[in-house]
């Protein structure tokens, strides 16, 4: 492998913004935010919207979007359905 062309692989903390669940993993992505982990070390903090703690496949709870789509708005506007 060529030297100097591969990104640095380091440990980071991922935080689910919906539930507050945090887990330590490896990643090449960095962050300016840091957090102190359970082992006393400080790691970069990466915020994610969905993780295994909040995804319906893993939790068994179905979550429906409340936003109306274009078709729904059209039907409401013209009194269809």
UniProtKB/Swiss-Prot annotation:
Part of the 50S ribosomal subunit. HAMAP family: Ribosomal_bL31_2. Belongs to the bacterial ribosomal protein bL31 family. Type B subfamily. One of its GO terms (cellular component) is ribonucleoprotein complex. PROSITE patterns: RIBOSOMAL_L31. Pfam families: Ribosomal_L31 (PF01197). The gene is rpmE2. The keyword Ribonucleoprotein applies. SUPFAM superfamilies: L28p-like. It comes from Bacillus cereus (strain ATCC 14579 / DSM 31 / CCUG 7414 / JCM 2152 / NBRC 15305 / NCIMB 9373 / NCTC 2599 / NRRL B-3711). NCBIfam families: L31, PRK01678.1. The keyword Disulfide bond does not apply. This is Large ribosomal subunit protein bL31B. GO terms for biological process: translation. One of its GO terms (molecular function) is structural constituent of ribosome. Signal peptide: none annotated. It comes from the Bacteria. Keywords: Ribonucleoprotein, Ribosomal protein.
């Amino acid at each position: 492998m060529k030297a100097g062309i591969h990104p640095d692989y380091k440990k980071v903390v991922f935080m689910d913004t919906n539930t507050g669940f945090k887990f330590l993993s490896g990643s090449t992505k960095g962050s300016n935010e840091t957090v102190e982990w359970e082992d006393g070390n400080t790691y970069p903090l990466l915020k994610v919207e969905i993780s295994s703690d909040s995804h319906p496949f893993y939790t068994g709870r179905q979550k429906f979007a409340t936003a109306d789509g274009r078709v729904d708005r059209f039907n409401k506007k013209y009194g269809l359905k």
